[in-house]
Design a protein with these regions (language model features):
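Histidine-dependent nucleotide/RNA phosphoesterase domain, centered on the 2H-phosphoesterase fold
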Residues: 1-193
């Protein structure tokens, strides 16, 4: 199953459900006046893609992911982001299933911009050059839900959520966050999950 339009772009991210992560996210947000839409939510970013991605492969891989354990490199603050006014607080992740998902999503819009895109957990953004120190336990086991979003030229966001009990739901919203009717291939993707 392929995304039909080569201009169709999106990302795969896991939405974390862990009290420690959310406490850290609040700490970041309380120190930052910056707003980056979905990037304000604590999540694991897997990869970016623009074409030739088999959605079924992504969904089948995710289906076996919950719950998962992940090794997190601690005290790794990254400030390398395209926005010169902001620093992103993120940590790298080591997990075989996450690596598999990342390998599926290796068709980047611009590999010169993103030559290596490793799975990482993003907590939020701070003003550029902000000193921020944090320490996490390593390894850190994560019980998570999964959110996969496909953005059609950033007009509509197609979001699938698989809960830890492997039930799932689907929502499609426009750029203003209002619900819209989904397209046919989404239902086909769900039919191949199990």
């Amino acid at each position: 199953m392929k995304i039909p339009d080569k201009n169709y772009s999106g990302f795969v991210m896991l939405k974390l459900e862990n009290p420690c992560f959310h406490e850290l996210q609040l700490e970041v947000q309380n120190n930052s006046p910056l707003a980056f839409e979905f990037e304000t939510d604590c999540h694991v970013s897997i990869g970016l893609f623009i074409e030739n991605i088999c959605i079924g492969d992504v969904l089948r891989t995710i289906w076996h992911l919950i719950p998962f354990g992940a090794m997190i490199k601690t005290d790794e603050l990254s400030s390398q982001f395209m926005n010169p006014d902001a620093s992103v607080v993120k940590f790298s992740l080591k997990n075989p299933t996450l690596s598999r998902l990342n390998s599926i999503c290796q068709s980047f819009p611009n590999k010169n911009m993103h030559p290596i895109y490793n799975p990482h957990v993003t907590f939020g953004y701070l003003p550029a050059n902000t000193e921020f120190k944090i320490r996490l336990t390593n390894p850190f086991f994560v019980i998570c839900g999964v959110m996969v979003s496909y953005n059609d030229n950033y007009e509509n966001s197609h979001t699938m959520y698989i809960a830890p009990d492997k039930t799932f739901s689907m929502s499609v919203t426009d750029k203003d966050g209002k619900p819209v009717q989904g397209s046919g291939w989404e239902a086909d993707a769900f039919s191949n999950l199990k």
